[in-house]
Amino acid sequence: MDVKFKFHFTRYILLGILLFFIINGVVENIIISRKINNFMRQAVLVDEDVENGIKFYCVSRETSKPSINKIDGKYYIGATGDILLKKASPYPEIPIFHQLTTYFVGGHAAYVVDSKTTIEINGKDKDNNTVSYYGNAWFSLKECIGVRLKNQSIVSDVTENIKSKIGTKYNYTFLFNNGYYCTDLMSASVYEVSHKDNINDFSVTTANDIIDSKNVEISYYHYTDNKEIKHVYYVN
């Protein structure tokens, strides 16, 4: 009897956790969709790069930091302190898992150091799995979301904090504090500077958590339509 009770109790607990995870994922995606749509609704078409199939839409905002820059003929997303996020999971080669991860978790994240440079960590390549500087190539993605900390006064300290983590190994366990995974690197770098500006929900940090956070606002979004036209929404 005790064994049977324990079995059923454990099963209900696991089902409860699964149900919570599903509901939380659905709610997060609804909120994210609303945030993106609200951001896009504020935009006005201001330019078009016909040759490269790009349309630019500006969201007017009081800021000295535009969220896209053109340097030497190339486009770079983000200003110092912005976080770039990819909704798609990094595992397109694994059907079903890729779709589920994309919906419930999201994909990769990067911290913008300057227009041309990001700080990231990638666990797919075990020979190159440390916090490192990267060239900012995020404009080449089919879809990208950029968020900006609402409290801009901490950006300088957060930037120095994340720079201090260069060389730290990837955390494959997601549980122990022996390294970082990409989105965890973003949230930890903010939280260690200012607890009140935390950008996750005090659990395992996902891309969805960061986009959904009340302490960030969307500053950039682009997607590529089925005609391969890239629609770019940015603040200026």
Language-model-detected regions and their locations in the chain:
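N-terminal Lys/Arg-rich, disordered targeting/topogenic segments
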Residues: 1-8
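Sec-dependent N-terminal signal peptides
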Residues: 8-18
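Activation targets extended, charge/polar-rich intrinsically disordered C-terminal tails
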Residues: 2, 20, 24-51, 55, ...
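Glycine-rich catalytic cores of cysteine/serine-nucleophile enzymes that process amide/ester linkages
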Residues: 72-148, 171-177
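A structural motif
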Residues: 148-166
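Extracytoplasmic/secreted proteins, especially bacterial periplasmic and envelope-associated proteins
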Residues: 105-108, 157, 161, 181-188
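Structured segments of extracytoplasmic/periplasmic soluble domains
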Residues: 87, 121, 160-169, 188-196, ...
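Short, structured beta-strand/loop micro-motifs enriched in basic residues and often containing a Trp
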Residues: 54-69
